[in-house]
């Protein structure tokens, strides 16, 4: 019911970001062939780290309204295939614990002029499961995803879907998530405005998590992000969900973000 891990150390992320692949340099007395250079540059490694005032996953707080540390590392091939991992600190209590770790892989590429698709499989893992009664709860689950995006001038748009089939960790139920994202780069400034809307049909719907029994619900957000220097950026967003407002869980919130990516 979550999406990332925040306990991944900032140092780990910064080291990961420093691993960005570059062409092979001279190796003492060994001659580097053109083929070796091409093979090396076919892969790239990127990293990111962020501090957020509240970890909101599809509008629902997974950090009880408190700050969270997040980060991830991706390895990509020029063919479009990639693998990666992302982590976040959480306050999941019983049985989710204090850490979410996401492992994923997929393919992304341009399928038409200005149109990009992204398809893959995401695995949500909770390695610090809180199990005081030794019930050995099943918390981890898989979720395939797909999205299509395009950019026209300063405007970007994405539509996506994620579907978790029936799994024990979801109580034997499934979950469908549909969403759309928009971005607008404000000309002459380092600021980008963003908007998001999502719809959940399943056990992860905000109203269902809030205890209403309604397994459908909406989430939304509006935000601004500003590039500060290099890969450093700051952002703020207003996040809301459909259903009862539970403080530190399903209430509307203003979320601040400080992030670095390389």
Q: Where would I find each of the regions flagged by the language model?
A:
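Cleavable N-terminal export/targeting peptides
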Residues: 1-44
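Transmembrane beta-strand segments of Gram-negative outer membrane beta-barrel proteins
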Residues: 39-53, 81
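Residues that define the transmembrane beta-barrel architecture of outer-membrane proteins
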Residues: 41-43, 65-69, 97-101, 138-142, ...
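Transmembrane beta-strands of outer-membrane beta-barrel pores
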Residues: 51-57, 87-91, 109, 123-127, ...
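Structural signature of outer-membrane beta-barrel channels/translocons
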Residues: 74-80, 106-110, 149-153, 183-187, ...
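Repeated loop/turn-to-beta-strand initiation elements of outer-membrane beta-barrel proteins
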Residues: 79-85, 113-119, 153-159, 188-195, ...
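Detector for outer-membrane/organellar transmembrane beta-barrel domains
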Residues: 139-212
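Outer-membrane beta-barrel "beta-signal"
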Residues: 222, 226, 249-262
């Amino acid at each position: 019911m979550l999406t990332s891990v925040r306990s991944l150390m900032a140092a780990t992320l910064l080291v990961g970001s420093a691993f960005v692949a570059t062409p092979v340099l001279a190796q003492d007395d060994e001659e580097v062939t053109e083929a070796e250079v091409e093979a090396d540059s076919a892969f790239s490694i990127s990293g990111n780290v962020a501090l957020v005032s509240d970890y909101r996953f599809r509008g629902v707080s997974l950090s009880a309204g408190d700050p969270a540390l997040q980060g991830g590392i991706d390895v990509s091939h020029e063919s479009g295939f990639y693998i990666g991992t992302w982590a976040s600190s959480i306050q999941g209590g019983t049985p989710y614990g204090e850490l979410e770790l996401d492992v994923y892989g997929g393919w992304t590429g341009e399928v038409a002029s200005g149109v990009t698709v992204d398809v893959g499989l995401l695995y949500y893992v909770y390695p610090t499961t809180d199990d005081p009664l030794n019930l050995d709860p099943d918390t981890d689950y898989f979720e395939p995803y797909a999205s299509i995006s395009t950019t026209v001038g300063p405007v970007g748009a994405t539509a996506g879907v994620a579907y978790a089939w029936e799994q024990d960790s979801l109580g034997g139920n499934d979950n469908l998530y549909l969403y759309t994202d928009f971005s607008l780069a404000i000309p002459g400034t380092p600021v980008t405005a963003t908007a998001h809307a999502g719809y959940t049909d399943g056990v992860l719907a905000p109203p269902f998590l809030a205890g209403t029994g309604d397994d459908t619900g909406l989430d939304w957000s509006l935000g601004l992000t500003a590039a500060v220097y290099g890969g450093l950026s700051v952002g703020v967003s207003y996040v809301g969900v459909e259903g009862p407002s539970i403080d530190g869980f399903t209430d509307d919130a203003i979320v601040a973000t400080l992030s670095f990516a390389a």
